[in-house]
Amino acid sequence: MEKDKVFAKPIEKRFEFDEEVASVFDDMIARSVPFYKENMALVRDIVVKNVVQKDRVYDLGCSTGSLLIDIAKRSPFSLELIGLDSSEAMLQRAHHKAKAFGVSIDFQKADIISYAYKPAKIFISNYTLQFIRPLKREPLVQKIYDALVDEGIFVFSEKVISADKTLDKQLLDIYFDFKKKQGYSDFEIAQKREALENVLVPYTLEENMEMVKKCGFGFVEPIFRWANFVTFVAIKRKK
């Protein structure tokens, strides 16, 4: 796995999932999101426990395909796994990894906002909604809800902010300390923060829950949290 050094040099553009990021993404995400491996294992297990033969599962912003590959390996059923991403560089790595593991996954280059979804049992979105502009975020969640079958599940992870400014700063400081322990320098941390400005737009935990409820989900609950990183499960059922 190539080590992430993307922000070791002065940035010249806003953050994007280009070839440079894709080449180090697996290392970047593992060192940038606390308990990422454990969190993805939790998401995988939620999915595996809620699918049956031929169920359709979408991963929105699938990046290099690691989660869908893990689901394919762990599920006792043959599933229709569809990974969508806007980055060709990410998808090339996803195709290569899936082939190496001998699993069948339909990776597609797509705009998840305009994509025509088929009925599905599961939707996954790991740290993807936060990159969708706020005006388009709720309409996307509505599309997800509409495409889910009854009792279908939307599992999504998001970086969140606190409504309390003091706590929010403290959580950010704790997070930056975490990144330093992962080997990132103060310069790299500052560079990435600047590159993500107005690209990653987080909501509070409450705003995320209110959004999915407004779209029709009868149940939503956080199932994992570390400081300002949260994973939610929302279920399509009558309130």
Curated annotation (Swiss-Prot):
Catalytic reaction equation(s): prephenate + S-adenosyl-L-methionine = carboxy-S-adenosyl-L-methionine + 3-phenylpyruvate + H2O
Biological processes, Gene Ontology terms: tRNA wobble uridine modification
Enzyme class: transferase
Gene3D superfamilies, sorted: Vaccinia Virus protein VP39
Enzyme Commission designation: 2.1.3.-
Matches recorded under Pfam families: Methyltransf_25
SUPFAM superfamilies from the UniProt entry: S-adenosyl-L-methionine-dependent methyltransferases (SSF53335)
Residues passing through the membrane, by range: none
Keywords, sorted A to Z: S-adenosyl-L-methionine, Transferase
Residues reported in the UniProt entry to bind S-adenosyl-L-methionine: 36, 61-63, 111-112, 126, 193
Functional note: Catalyzes the conversion of S-adenosyl-L-methionine (SAM) to carboxy-S-adenosyl-L-methionine (Cx-SAM).
Subunit structure: Homodimer.
Family: Belongs to the class I-like SAM-binding methyltransferase superfamily. Cx-SAM synthase family.
Protein's name according to its UniProt entry: Carboxy-S-adenosyl-L-methionine synthase
